[in-house]
């Protein structure tokens, strides 16, 4: 994958997250802000999830209350470099824990 492909894939992922949050109908208020390729999700309890791209490594990083994760793109999805867990599944798990209700990204 070259840098251009990486940015296109990372942009698609960020846009999908934004669209999912914009259509979220749960009770929790989840705000998001994107600045310089870094997306920050802020929850009612003040906790945050940070998603950012690491261009030199062609990775997307996810920082949650439970820990940090690095994701590589393969076979149409982003997978954790340690556990093999898919990005949207891990994000759903972390967002649900931090929101106190089910938050599904796919």
From Swiss-Prot:
Transmembrane intervals: none
Entry GO MF terms: ferric iron binding; ferrous iron binding
Keyword Ribosomal protein: no
Keywords attached to this entry: Iron, Metal-binding
InterPro entries: CyaY, Frataxin/CyaY, Frataxin/CyaY_sf, Frataxin_CS
CDD domains registered for this protein in UniProt: Frataxin
GO biological process: iron-sulfur cluster assembly
Keyword Membrane carried by entry: no
One GO cellular component term: cytosol
Superkingdom to which the source organism belongs: Bacteria
Role noted for this protein: Involved in iron-sulfur (Fe-S) cluster assembly. May act as a regulator of Fe-S biogenesis.
Family, similarity comment: Belongs to the frataxin family.
Protein name: Iron-sulfur cluster assembly protein CyaY
Top-level taxonomy: Bacteria, Pseudomonadati, Pseudomonadota, Gammaproteobacteria, Enterobacterales
Protein's gene: cyaY
